[in-house]
Amino acid sequence: ERLLPQMFSNEGPSISNYDLNNDGIQDFYIGGAKGQTSNIFMSNSSGYEKISSPFEIHKDSEDVQSIFFDADNDGDQDLYVASGGKAFSKLSRTLNDRLYRNEKGIFKYDSSALSFSNFFSTGAAEVGDINNDGYLDIIIGERFDVDTYGIPGSISVLINRGDGTFETSYPPELKNIGMITDISITDINADNKKDIIVVGEWMQISVYINSENKWELVSDKIGLKDTNGIWQSIESDDFNNDGIPDFVVGNMGQNGFYKPNMKFYLNDFDKNGKLETIYTYKINGDDYPIHDRDELIKQLPELKKKLLYYKDYSVQTINDVFDKDLLLSSYTRYLDETKSLILLSKGSQSYEIIYMPDEIQYSSVHAISIEDVNLDGKKDLILGGNQFLVKPQFGAYDASKGWIMYGSENSNKLFDNFKPLNIYGQIRDFSIVKDLKSSDSLILIAGISDSKIITKNVK
């Protein structure tokens, strides 16, 4: 995949927290990268104890998502761990998601709880009672095809049988919808049924209403038609207190490779049985390949005779380089939006787009946490991101040190001011726990790709 602008080997780590031992202090799970053991950190009188069992047996997986929830309805928290990344064969069991049951405080892997028809790289996992039977179900989003970036992935719906085992279904309306990075489960239309909001790379913000045993896509109807983005994250809350969920959605920002009106074309351009992805920028109404001549010819050697000179290639559009029929038969996607934003409900299933401040658009937003950090009764946003694994000619997304946006006391706006967290690195997840030494202090735990976990007092 020589033509890809970035690598996709830094999806994690994931952090999840819950007070597992009922001591009033949040415990947390940190997922490991490929070759690293995941751990639970359990609070005790002297700090935290690291628990590695039973996660050692799955250290060859890359744990990209994790959720504490009561899977078997026995009153304690079990753990769902999603495996992803691109460093695996699509025939590898290391891509399998896992359920660990909490048995009197000891987590045990349950190999019979989950069943999938094939292996895939998970990009998103969320829980909610989809069928209103009182048991928590799981929605899983496929991140990408591990062999070919660009092929759209699907949603899997795991229905809880009530005993912590799950029946997997693949709704046809949720098949091949995109390269999914995050999911929010909430009731959009106040009908007491859980709906799903799906975001991903080269995807529209996709709102699916849970309607009569099918999922109805309503994004265009509620004002989200032109929202194709490189979305990385989504969280929901009710910021304007109207009883309707609002959303914070993280994108790649305005300071890097991805631009509005950008496209990609996916096809077997050299007829060798393998798909290639060609990216273009739109300039004066025409689409131009972004790849330099040498890298394009290395991937597609038959173009060498056609692209003899650099100066000629520099003015050639995608239609000059490739045959019209080949382009028409390609799977194509385009971008409308690269800014991170807030979707604020306006009632009647419609949303207003509010863009985050310019400084936050300097880099990507991969991690979002919503918390009243300063205890003023207003919801604050904690944001983090960056993506270093971009080709040098395009430049890394490295201008963010994380942000706190403080909720406003002014009813005319959502947030008053913001300040940097001063955390350097590729932030992929956040968790908030109480400070062991101070009951009114909050500790932010930041999961940094290819780096140590960072803790920071945010209150």
PLM segments and residue spans:
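Beta-propeller-forming repeat regions
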Residues: 1-459
